[in-house]
């Protein structure tokens, strides 16, 4: 085993950086974790805690026959710190994994800071360290000086898109004589509050969104803004067509107020909602609720006026209004290998949204792999590549091999997995087959490299460097 001459440097304590720093330290390698907050705040963050969830508080579906849920299970078996803490701070969200974002981030901050091999430096790095092993996890809001230095290093302009966050309201301000608790098709707990709209209410709400005054974008004109399709502002959906929202975040199917009786009763057919606004619990106490799918760039006064048009929210008290910010990412297919190393400098690794993976879970997965490989490099070992039959492995294969000219951020999904040899015709069976293949291949890979948990969902494991 090689002698460790200097600590690994991790830049950025978001989801990816927090996971990376932990994996490095757990492998017995000292690490210095740089975080510029609170010395310098980003446009989207509200605290100085590590792994702050700046958009939703949900990591997506938990079921392992869904891409998001399968990625969760992969990360649990790999010994992810972030997913261990997500389970500890889970709040009701039907079939989704949602967390109390404040408790989750504060716990992660304490846990990482208390590790004897982790040194925290609350300062901004304005340029890439030129020596040693470095893991870059600065996210889509990388500070201007560091972004300029990275641009100089890669010789490339950044790609970019606009991202947005949803408003949060207090639970006591929601009229629960109108809003009702339910999960779609009664799956899981009745964890969502649902605000029903009839046709007239929906059309008036859509008209208000289409004609509302938007906040001015700082980076360039609104007309040239590109949005990530998985996180479109609600007003953008409204502009795309009369029914677009009803087939998206305001989809009413599978939801009915049980106080009115059975939705299947003939007399209740006319009482089915034309559209539904869902609110998801933000904290364990149920004091805060997030408007699901209501990312927005409306001015704050307009948000209050228009969102209070929603039945049940006429007296809503907003603790956070929706915000929009520009996300930048590098053209990963031209720069990175599937090990998340830069080809022109293998001791520089990167993870998170900066490399074009989309979503919280993907950032954690990238942090896990980049951190694991940084530790292996420090110990004189060869870096690893995850099997591409895994959701995580397929994602990193995609971002390292896609067509650079058309590269856009990619979320976890089954569409980028290798084809099954004998795919079932039924979609549910096909997704289950993807899951079974992935978990078997992960188990084989773990046994080969002596890494992580070999049994499902057993919490933390010590990273092994074999």
Curated annotation (Swiss-Prot):
<dbReference type="GO" id="GO:0047151">
    <property type="term" value="F:tRNA (uracil(54)-C5)-methyltransferase activity, 5,10-methylenetetrahydrofolate-dependent"/>
</dbReference>
<keyword id="KW-0285">Flavoprotein</keyword>
<keyword id="KW-0963">Cytoplasm</keyword>
<dbReference type="GO" id="GO:0050660">
    <property type="term" value="F:flavin adenine dinucleotide binding"/>
</dbReference>
<dbReference type="Pfam" id="PF01134">
    <property type="entry name" value="GIDA"/>
</dbReference>
<protein>
    <recommendedName>
        <fullName>Methylenetetrahydrofolate--tRNA-(uracil-5-)-methyltransferase TrmFO</fullName>
        <ecNumber>2.1.1.74</ecNumber>
    </recommendedName>
</protein>
<keyword id="KW-0521">NADP</keyword>
<dbReference type="InterPro" id="IPR004417">
    <property type="entry name" value="TrmFO"/>
</dbReference>
<keyword id="KW-0819">tRNA processing</keyword>
<comment type="similarity">
    <text>Belongs to the MnmG family. TrmFO subfamily.</text>
</comment>
<dbReference type="InterPro" id="IPR036188">
    <property type="entry name" value="FAD/NAD-bd_sf"/>
</dbReference>
<feature type="binding site">
    <location>
        <begin position="12"/>
        <end position="17"/>
    </location>
    <ligand>
        <name>FAD</name>
    </ligand>
</feature>
<keyword id="KW-0274">FAD</keyword>
<dbReference type="GO" id="GO:0030488">
    <property type="term" value="P:tRNA methylation"/>
</dbReference>
<keyword id="KW-0808">Transferase</keyword>
<dbReference type="GO" id="GO:0005829">
    <property type="term" value="C:cytosol"/>
</dbReference>
<keyword id="KW-0489">Methyltransferase</keyword>
<dbReference type="GO" id="GO:0002098">
    <property type="term" value="P:tRNA wobble uridine modification"/>
</dbReference>
<dbReference type="InterPro" id="IPR040131">
    <property type="entry name" value="MnmG_N"/>
</dbReference>
<comment type="function">
    <text>Catalyzes the folate-dependent formation of 5-methyl-uridine at position 54 (M-5-U54) in all tRNAs.</text>
</comment>
<dbReference type="InterPro" id="IPR002218">
    <property type="entry name" value="MnmG-rel"/>
</dbReference>
<keyword id="KW-0520">NAD</keyword>
């Amino acid at each position: 085993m090689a002698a460790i001459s200097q600590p690994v440097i991790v830049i950025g304590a978001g989801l990816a950086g927090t996971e990376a720093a932990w994996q490095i330290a757990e492998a017995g390698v000292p690490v210095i974790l740089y975080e510029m907050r609170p010395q310098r705040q980003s446009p989207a963050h509200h605290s100085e805690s590590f792994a702050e969830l700046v958009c939703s508080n949900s990591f997506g579906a938990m079921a392992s026959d869904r891409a998001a849920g399968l990625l969760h299970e992969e990360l649990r078996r790999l010994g992810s710190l972030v997913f261990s803490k997500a389970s500890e701070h889970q709040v009701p969200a039907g079939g989704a994994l949602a967390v109390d974002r404040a408790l989750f981030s504060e716990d992660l901050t304490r846990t990482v800071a208390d590790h004897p091999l982790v040194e925290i430096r609350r300062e901004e790095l304005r340029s890439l360290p030129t020596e040693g092993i470095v893991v870059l996890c600065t996210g889509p809001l990388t500070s201007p000086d560091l972004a300029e230095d990275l641009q100089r290093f890669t010789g490339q302009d950044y790609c970019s898109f606009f991202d947005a966050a949803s408003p949060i309201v207090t639970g006591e301000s929601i009229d629960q004589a109108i809003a009702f608790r339910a999960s779609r098709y009664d799956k899981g707990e009745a964890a969502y509050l649902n605000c029903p709209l009839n046709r007239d209410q929906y059309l008036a709400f859509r008209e208000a969104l289409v004609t509302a005054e938007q906040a001015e974008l700082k980076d360039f004109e609104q007309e040239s803004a590109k949005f990530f399709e998985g996180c479109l502002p609600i007003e953008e959906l409204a502009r795309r067509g009369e029914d677009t929202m009803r087939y998206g975040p305001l989809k009413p199917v599978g939801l009915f107020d049980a106080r009115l009786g059975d939705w299947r009763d003939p007399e209740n057919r006319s009482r089915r909602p034309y559209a539904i606004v869902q609110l998801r619990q933000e904290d364990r106490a149920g004091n805060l609720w997030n408007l699901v799918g209501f990312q927005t760039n409306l001015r704050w006064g307009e948000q209050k006026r228009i969102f209070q048009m929603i039945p049940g929210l006429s007296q809503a008290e907003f603790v956070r209004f929706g915000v929009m910010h520009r996300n930048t990412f590098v053209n990963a297919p031209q720069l990175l290998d599937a090990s998340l190393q830069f080809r022109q400098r293998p001791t520089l690794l990167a993870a998170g949204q900066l490399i074009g993976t989309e979503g919280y879970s993907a950032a954690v997965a990238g942090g896990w792999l980049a951190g694991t490989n940084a530790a292996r490099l420090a110990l004189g070992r060869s870096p690893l590549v995850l099997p591409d039959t895994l959701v995580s492995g397929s994602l990193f294969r995609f971002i390292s091999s896609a067509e650079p000219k058309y590269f856009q951020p990619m979320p976890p999904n089954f569409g980028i997995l290798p084809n099954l040899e004998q795919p079932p015709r039924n979609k549910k069976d096909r997704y289950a087959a993807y899951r079974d293949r992935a978990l078997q291949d992960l188990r084989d890979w773990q046994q080969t490299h002596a890494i992580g948990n070999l049994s499902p969902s057993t919490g933390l494991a010590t990273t092994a460097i074999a």
